[in-house]
C-alpha cells in the first residue's frame, strides 16, 4: 500500500460463486452489492474520477463514496424512466419476460458505470459498446441484439446516428455524471435501485451484453449473467487490509471486460479505483500525473502504456516501482520492457481472461517467487486444463472454462505454456488457435474482411494480414501472376481501392492507412499452409519476419510530409493532422484532439508526421527527438502544438516582423446521409397482389421496425394504375389499409425479368439508396408448367440479387437481406429417398427429392441460385429461402384463395396471416440469418374431426362421405365445368397422400428459433374452418 494512506474498516460483501441450493440470503447481483456497500460502507470512497480543469493542463479529482454511488444510480434510474420508453421485466404466464436491451456508447468514466448499474438494477439488458467501434460494427450489434435505444456521448453521436440509420433504435444523449452527484444530497438511503424482477435465475445471461470480434470480422454479442459479473468482485487474493485498500489507478476502458475488474475490486474489498478523464486517451505523462495526485497504491493498464512509461526513463520507472503491483493485460508486454521494469523493482502482475469467461487470473501483491511472464490461474473457478500436442520440446495446454449461466463449456482459443517452477498454476499464452491479431494497444483485429476483399481481385493469389503486438496492421499480398518488382508501386495503386473498401467495414484501430503497409510477394513464393490447406499464419509471419519489420520501419518515416511554415503554422499543423486522421476540416485549432475522437493509433500517426515535418523544414531550430511518442498527448490541440514550436526554449527563432494571425474557420464539408433518419427499414416486396404476399405487406407495415414498403407490381395492362391494382387486390382479400398505412406503401409498376427490374434508371437508383430488405414472394401458381416456362422467374431472381449487390456497392455500410419464398414441393419425395419423414432445414442433396413437376424443379433452381450467392457474395448480401408448407386461409377474415390448390387438402394447415407474420419475423430477425427455413404448422390434425366440422357447416350427412379412391374416380369422371378439383387430378393421384397426410413433415427448428409467432402457432380451430367455408359461400364458390 502506498505511503501516507490510512486503513479504514471495510466490511466485505458475502459472495459465493457456487452457493448451496439452500443459501438464499446471499448477494446475487452487482446492484445488490452497491446497496450492501451503501449500508455497510457508506463513507468509504468507491472511486476518484479525474477531470480536466478549464485550461486542460491540471487534473482535479471528484470523490464518490459508496453512499453517493448508490444515490447517483438512483437518480439515474429516475432519469432513465422519465426519458426512455423502457421495457421493464414483467411476470407473464408465471415467468419473467425482459424487454429489449439499451445500448451504451459512452466515454469511459464513472458516468458509464452509473448508467450500466442503473439499467442492470432495472432488469433492462445492457449492450456495452466500445467507443472505438466503427458504424458498421455498431449497426451489426444493434441488429443482432434488437436494442431498443442507444445512449451516446456527444463526441460519439455522429457514429451512433450513422450506425442506427436503418434501425429502430432511438438515440439519446446522457446527462453527465455530475448531474446525478449534485442532486443526491439529503436523499433517503432506503430507496432500492433493484427492480423486483431484475434477477430471474442463474441461467439468465441476458443481463450485460459485451462484445468481441466474430469470425466474419464484425463483433459478436457476448451475453453474460449476474453470477458472471459477481466473479469480477471475487477476482483477487487480497486477504490483508494493507493489500486490499489504497487507490488503484486504472486506464482500462469500462466498456471492455478487463476494465470491469478495477471497479469490481472497489466493490469487493474497498480498493478505491481512480479513473482518468473520459474524454482523453491515456498517455504516459498523463498517467504519471494521475498516479501522483491520487497517491496511488497500484496500477492497472495495457502493455502499450507501460512501454511508453518505460521510455520516459527514471521518472516513469521510479513512479511504478513504488506501487504494490502494476497489473497489465489485454496484450503481451515486450520482454525487453518487462525485464527493465522488473530489474528496477516494479512489481509486474500478468492478468488474463476472455470476454466469454471473465477474469481468469486473480489480483494479488506479487512476491519474490512470482515470474511476471506468467499469469496465475484462479482457484475459485471451475477450470479444466488439458495437455495438447507439444511444440517441439515445449509442452502446450488448452484451457476450458465453464461460464456462469452457459450450459456448455467454453474452450479458449489460446495455447498455453506453463511455468516450470509452478506448472499447475502459472501459465502464459503463446498463440491463438484462431486468426485474431492482438495489437500493442490490446485491441483485437479480425482480418477476414480485409483478406477476403483483397482475394476477390484477379491480381491477388492470397492475402495475409499481420500486425501482432504492433500499433497498426499491414497485409502480405501474394500476386496471382509474375510481375517485375519495378511495377509494384503501380500494383499497389490498383489494389488500394480494395483496401479502402475494406477499411469502411473495419474499426478505426484495424484500418490500413498507408500503401506502404501493403507488402507484395511474387506469385512463385511458397506460402506455408496447414494439412487442411488453410494458411499457417504464424509460419507466414516467421518466414517474412524481416520484410514485415521493414514495413514498420518505413511506416515510422511515412505519412504526409509537409513543411511547417512559421507564417502559417496553425494552418499547416491542422492540414497535417487532417491528413493523418481523414477528418473533414470542420474543427478549430483550439479543439482538444482527443475530445474530438482521436484514438491512440491516430496519435502515433500524427507524431510520426510531425517528426518528418520537423526533420524536413525545421531541422536546426528544433530537434526531431523533441517530438516524442507522448507529444500529441502533452499538446492535444493545434494551438498547443504551435505554442510549443514558438517557445524560445525549444530553439525556434521567429522571423522578423512575424505576428500570430487569427485563424479563420474553413468551410464545412457537405455530408450526405441516407434517406432514413429514424432508423427504420425499407422493404422491397414482390408478389404483393398474391395471397401470401398481400398478407406479408400487411404484416410488414404493422411492424414498428418498418419505415416503408416498396411493392413491385406487374401491371395487368397499360391502362391500370399499379397502385389501384394493389388496392383492389387487397380489398378482394378483405384486407383494408388505413390512410396512415397507405402512406407507408410505394407501388411501382414493373417487369422484374427486364433490365433494372423494368424500372426507370431513376426509380432503380431510389431502390439502391433506400432498400435494406428484399422479400421475393412473387411466383406463378401453375402445376402444368414445365421447367423451361420459368425462365423469367430465374431472370427475376437474378435481377433482385444484382440489386442487392448494387445496394451494398452504393452504401457499403448496408448489407441487404434477401429472402425468397420456396416450397415444400422441392422436398416432396424426401421421405422416399432418405427413408425418414422429417425433412431438415438443409439444402436439397438430390433431385430425386423433388416432386416431378416443373413448379418444384423451378423452385429448386432458385434455391441453388441463392446458395451460390451466399457462397460467393457473403460480404455484400445476406440471402435465405423459406420452404412453405401448406398455407390455409386467413385466421381473421376467412379469406382463402379458390385458385390456390388444396383448400382442405392438407393435414397441417397454417393460416396465411400467421405464415406472413412468421416470414416478417424471419426477414427482420436481428440474429444471423440461416440459409434455409421451413414454415409449416407443426400441429398435425385429425382428418376425421376436420371432416365432421366441414360436414356440419355444409349440412352433409355421414353417408355423403366417400372413401378416397372412390372420390378420385368421381372427380375424374365428372366434367370440367364447376369442377375445380379436376385440374389437380394428377396431384391427387400422385402426391396428395404423401404430402397432405403426414408422409412429408417439414422440420422447423431454425425457423421457430427466429420466429415467436411460429413458436406459438396452434392447430386450426373449428371457428377458423367455419370462416373459410363462409367466405367461399359469400363469393359463390360453395352453394
UniProtKB/Swiss-Prot annotation:
Domain annotation Carrier: ranges: 567-649
Alphabetically ordered keywords of this record: ATP-binding, NADP, Nucleotide-binding, Oxidoreductase, Phosphopantetheine, Phosphoprotein
Molecular function terms, GO-annotated: ATP binding; medium-chain fatty acid-CoA ligase activity; oxidoreductase activity
Modification O-(pantetheine 4'-phosphoryl)serine occurs at: 600
UniProt region (Adenylation (A) domain), positions on chain: 91-366
Disruption of the gene: reported phenotype: Abolishes the production of cichorine and leads to the accumulation of 3-methylorsellinic acid.
GO biological process: cichorine biosynthetic process; fatty acid metabolic process
The protein's name: Adenylate-forming reductase cicB
Source organism (scientific name): Emericella nidulans (strain FGSC A4 / ATCC 38163 / CBS 112.46 / NRRL 194 / M139) (Aspergillus nidulans)
Lineage of origin: Eukaryota, Fungi, Dikarya, Ascomycota, Pezizomycotina
